[in-house]
Amino acid sequence: LYTKDGEKYFIVDSHMHYWSAGPDNWVPGAEQYAKGWIECFHAYQSLGPKETHWPIEKFMSYTEDDLMKDVFEDGHVDVAVFQPTYLKEWYTEGFNTTERNAALGEKHPGMFIANTRFDPRDGDVGLTELRRNVERYGSKGVKLYTAEWNNGSRGYKLSDPAAYRYLEAAQNLGIKNVHVHKGPTIWPLDKDAFDVSDVDHAATDFPELNFIVEHVGLPRIEDFCFMATQEPNVYAGLSVAIGGLMHARPKFFAKVMGELLFWVGEDKMTFGSDYGIWEPKWQIEGFVDWDYPSDEFSDYPRLGTAGKKKILGLNAARLYDIKVPDECQLPAEAGTPAAQDDAQLVTGA
């Protein structure tokens, strides 16, 4: 548990990775994409504090020991949620697979939740794989990458009939949480394939699923906010927003947080470090201390200690049925974490 000024914070890192991106895993003939992808990822790390930057060699292939130290020993995290990204067009064994993540999780019981993924372009074979992964690893969530390349296709939409087939199957298998990458583009993927409009469509038609929009739709923050405020089952995943903006662009971060707090609300926001792009320690410590930098942001809702506790762990804990220690529970008057009616626009109406 992270403790600051007598307050205890239960931390759930709801978006992190354990990837393998070294040259030995590059698909022959696609080396330029595998190399370019991980170099683009590495460039994002420069948006964090200088003392947290890694050499590219470590970044490509950090170890289990690196992860356990950075995330749990030094990083204040109590439970971490693996979000897989396959990219098998470029990485022979996959970039960051369910199997790789789950193998680490099985070595450290109670510390990880292993989500899986699907790609509706994989047809019946993909449905079989989804079912097998849920049964094998007990996954309660999926990570979707709508801009991923697949056999000549450079993306899909959640509103596609094929995607609906998979969403129905996932729901029937007990999946509750759908994490969708809708944020900054990584070379060579297409920016438009990360547009948030398809989430609006799917969230309406699958009200029993929670759609966590990772990276809050950046750079489409206003599109995301205006959609999420009227879709009760759409949540804001703050990975990249905190890691990429809090240190490097504090005023822009304040605007992003202000818009999210006004339209979406503190009950529908979840922390994610996006490790190994950024280490969680500085993000958590900085967010606990964070406030708007000037009166320029006076028309946005304030974020107090209770709200920070929700965002840093209690909201995700409720979405994933994670037991929270009694000393980290909020009093009833602080509201219910992960409640679907918390947007400032709604409560103020």
Language-model segments: which ranges?
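Conserved, mostly hydrophobic/aromatic
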Residues: 15, 105, 133, 142, ...
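Histidine-centered divalent metal-coordination motifs
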Residues: 15-21, 181, 215
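Short active-site segment of divalent metal-dependent hydrolases/proteases
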Residues: 18-19, 184, 218, 277
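Short aromatic-enriched loop/helix-cap "lid" or pocket-rim segments at secondary-structure transitions
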Residues: 22-28, 94-95, 127-129, 154-156, ...
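Alpha-helical scaffolding within the catalytic cores
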Residues: 62-69, 96-102, 126-130, 196-199, ...
